[in-house]
Amino acid sequence: MGEGDAFWAPSVLPHSTLSTLSHHPQPQFGRRMESKVSEGGLNVTLTIRLLMHGKEVGSIIGKKGETVKKMREESGARINISEGNCPERIVTITGPTDAIFKAFAMIAYKFEEDIINSMSNSPATSKPPVTLRLVVPASQCGSLIGKGGSKIKEIRESTGAQVQVAGDMLPNSTERAVTISGTPDAIIQCVKQICVVMLESPPKGATIPYRPKPASTPVIFAGGQAYTIQGQYAIPHPDQLTKLHQLAMQQTPFPPLGQTNPAFPGEKLPLHSSEEAQNLMGQSSGLDASPPASTHELTIPNDLIGCIIGRQGTKINEIRQMSGAQIKIANATEGSSERQITITGTPANISLAQYLINARLTSEVTGMGTL
């Protein structure tokens, strides 16, 4: 293996060169790899991604960034932290194996120090373990677990660390969380063994990396503009919600009271005209009291309900988050070819949810692909 070969583990980017490892005889290569990794002498560059909460990230960064600066300088690893408006953050550590393990040691010991400090003001007598969460491509988790759980059992027994591989993938990704708990020394040994497994078993296909979503902030609509509430002020919302809301009001207006929607004959319409909905949205002030919640019902053919729900509920959850409406899908009724959807919220919430549902249906019926 030549100098400068770059490997991404355990979180491996799609363009990695890990596939070159598959040409080596596996058992002999594995022993040689494990020995070199343990000694910190394997000449590869690793990228390991950690999932941390805000408090943990704050501990790593330190006052004015002094702690993370010290970790970078003393370990020789590159340590990058994802943007700060998310409850969860991704900490990416890149470098040669010895630099990676030094960085991990510093992080683990820093967390242990935090635990000891927190216990000084607590009646607890037993010290809780240090816990780190790695982000690993789901296609590599099988190798990490091993046949019948043999590999993960071996790692637990040889390092003394507790290792748990999440059963579900992280949202909107093909990665899983691997939680490691124990003493700092046990965690370091565990990470070394996990790196060996990841290097021996490259990910299959492209990996969709997990990207934590920003913390949700209240959104209100006024005068066709979306605003987020920050403290006592309403700040214009910068993303696409405003455009979506405008589209919703233009393309799926509330028909006059008593009329049905020609696109969905069984649909019961809300008791608001388009003009009334606009008035209720608070044209005069961005901080007017929210309009009263109303309920909107529609029926969808059974053969189209899947495109609304999405795999494991991903699409309906997206529609809920983007619209701010409560959306309930009734269970299938025997003998019925349709399912009822109930949307509850303000007229603006309902209108946006209806637009997004109609867009999904149009996409499915016309074969335009997923939105």
From Swiss-Prot:
The keyword Plastid does not apply. Residues 45-95, 129-182, 293-357 form the KH domain. Transmembrane segments: none annotated. The keyword RNA-binding applies. GO terms for molecular function: C-rich single-stranded DNA binding; mRNA binding; RNA binding. Its main location: cytoplasm. PROSITE patterns: KH_TYPE_1. Signal peptide: none annotated. It is found in: Cytoplasm. One of its GO terms (cellular component) is extracellular exosome. Pfam families: KH_1 (PF00013). One of its GO terms (biological process) is negative regulation of transcription by RNA polymerase II. It comes from the Eukaryota. Keywords: Cytoplasm, DNA-binding, Repeat, Ribonucleoprotein, RNA-binding. Single-stranded nucleic acid binding protein that binds preferentially to oligo dC. This is Poly(rC)-binding protein 3. The gene is PCBP3.
